[in-house]
């Protein structure tokens, strides 16, 4: 809510997996009611749910209909890769694991390792950079986070990116990892 995200969609396969995924759906609604009851009553927060296979299609056709998505691990693996592809691939998608009870958090790239291109100056650092942006926001360092976000947006608008993204940009200028990092630092 503090980030102006007022709709939560619980993505599940509860129609088939009634106890596990159906339980997740019930838990999600119960948690929202317990933690955000007043916001639900006032309409400030809307919680709905969607069967995962329908969500996969709808998210491609009408992404603007979704703001915050909560799902279980297996569905999340499919959903996160599909949605990352919509914005350039997993090389740009940030990730975070946050325990909202303790406040402990880990921010990380959403993808795994790529040993086949290690040391070749080909890696897109945007995922880990944007994960750091999320960390800065989480810590309340919003101005620093915004400076980095603005710098990345400037580069992407100019068509400056690593090869995995530049190939999709009109007049894209593909840079290696180090050169891209240097350009980002200059753009700050």
Language-model segment annotations:
Residues 58-160:
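Glycine-rich phosphate/nucleotide-binding loop
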Residues 1-50:
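Glycine-rich phosphate/diphosphate-binding loop of Rossmann-like nucleotide-binding domains
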Residues 50-57:
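Short acidic loop-to-helix transition motifs that present clustered carboxylates
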Residues 1-2, 14-17, 147, 153-188:
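Glycine-rich phosphate/pyrophosphate-binding loop and the adjoining helix
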Residues 21, 25, 125-129, 177:
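Short alpha-helical patches at coil-to-helix transitions and adjacent helical residues
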Residues 14-18, 22, 45-49, 68-69, ...:
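Hydrophobic alpha-helical scaffolding
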Residues 27, 31-34, 135, 151, ...:
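Generic, well-ordered alpha-helical scaffold segments in large soluble proteins
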């Amino acid at each position: 809510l503090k980030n102006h995200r007022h709709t939560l969609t619980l993505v599940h396969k509860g129609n088939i997996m009634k106890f596990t995924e159906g339980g997740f759906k019930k838990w999600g609604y119960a948690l929202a009611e317990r933690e955000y009851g007043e916001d639900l009553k006032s309409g400030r927060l809307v919680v709905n749910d969607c069967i995962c296979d329908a969500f996969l299609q709808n998210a491609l056709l009408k992404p603007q209909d979704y703001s915050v998505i909560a799902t279980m691990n297996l569905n999340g693996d499919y959903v996160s890769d599909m949605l990352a592809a919509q914005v350039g691939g997993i090389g740009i998608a940030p990730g975070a694991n946050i325990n909202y009870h303790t406040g402990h958090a880990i921010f990380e790239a959403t993808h795994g390792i790529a040993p086949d291109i290690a040391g070749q100056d080909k890696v897109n650092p945007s995922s880990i950079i944007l994960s750091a942006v999320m960390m800065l926001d989480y810590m309340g360092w919003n101005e620093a986070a915004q400076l980095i976000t603005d710098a990345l947006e400037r580069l992407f608008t100019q068509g400056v990116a690593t090869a995995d993204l530049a190939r999709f940009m009109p007049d894209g200028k593909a840079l290696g990892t180090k050169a891209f990092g240097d350009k980002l630092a200059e753009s700050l």
